[in-house]
Amino acid sequence: EFASAYMADLKQFLVAQKNEGRQIFPRGPEYFRALDLTPLDKVRVVILGQDPYHGDGQAHGLCFSVRPGVRTPPSLVNIYKELNTDLGIPPARHGFLESWARQGVLLLNSVLTVRARERASHQGHGWEKFTDAIIRAVNEAEHPVVFMLWGSYAQKKAAFVDRSRHLVLRAPHPSPLSAHSGFLGCRHFSQANAFLESKGFDPIDWRLPENPAADIN
């Protein structure tokens, strides 16, 4: 994919943005952090997001996750609420999700960069094609995977996933605008673990370390 013409165009766009003095989130080394932490052959669960957080110091390459020391965003607060209801896991005091990624949870945004403080500013420049290719590769993998598709955007993006081989879980987005329409109470986390165990895989430990700094390398 990196040799594709659209990726060359995307690189040119990002270079031009930087040359114009635009600040881009996350930092360059973190564009592909989700894939660095969760290689495709290790993927057990896919959670899809849309764009990186556009506030200062938030995004670090994993959807829904924020750096240690950053206030937990509202959607992630609702994810923690559902984890508590579903599995009895107390809400973490931080929003740093790298321990999930290291266990095989691919926390993938559809678009991997954003201009600082400008929501959705890098949509339509090629990232969507790249992340479509990632989802296709996971779909074609030999081992079964759980897809957690929250909200219509994620559900459309992964509509082609083979449900005869993979577990596809759908719910409204955990945003405060929609969480009470069916995300809260969806029990996706326990369903994911039951599926993984039924296929002979270890369940995901959805608990997060108390000290997120210990999870950074």
From Swiss-Prot:
Q: What are its E.C. numbers?
A: 3.2.2.27
Q: Check the record and name the PROSITE patterns matching this protein.
A: U_DNA_GLYCOSYLASE
UniProt signal peptide = none
A Gene Ontology cellular component where this protein is annotated is: cytoplasm
Q: Which GO terms describe its biological process?
A: base-excision repair, AP site formation via deaminated base removal
- Please give the InterPro entries that the UniProt record associates with this protein: UDG_fam1 (IPR002043), Ura-DNA_Glyclase_AS (IPR018085), Uracil-DNA_glycosylase-like (IPR005122), Uracil-DNA_glycosylase-like_sf (IPR036895)
An example Pfam family from this entry, by short name, is UDG
Question: Keywords for this entry?
Answer: Cytoplasm, DNA damage, DNA repair, Hydrolase
- Single annotated GO MF: uracil DNA N-glycosylase activity
Enzyme class (EC, first level): hydrolase
Its localization reads: Cytoplasm
Q: Which reaction does it catalyse?
A: Hydrolyzes single-stranded DNA or mismatched double-stranded DNA and polynucleotides, releasing free uracil
Residues forming the catalytic site: D51 (proton acceptor)
User: Where would you say this protein principally sits, based on its record?
Assistant: cytoplasm
Q: Which domain of life is it from?
A: Bacteria
Against PANTHER family, the record matches this protein to: URACIL-DNA GLYCOSYLASE
NCBIfam families for the chain: PRK05254.1-1, PRK05254.1-2, PRK05254.1-4, PRK05254.1-5, ung
Family, per entry: Belongs to the uracil-DNA glycosylase (UDG) superfamily. UNG family.
What name is this protein filed under? Uracil-DNA glycosylase
What's the name of its gene?
ung
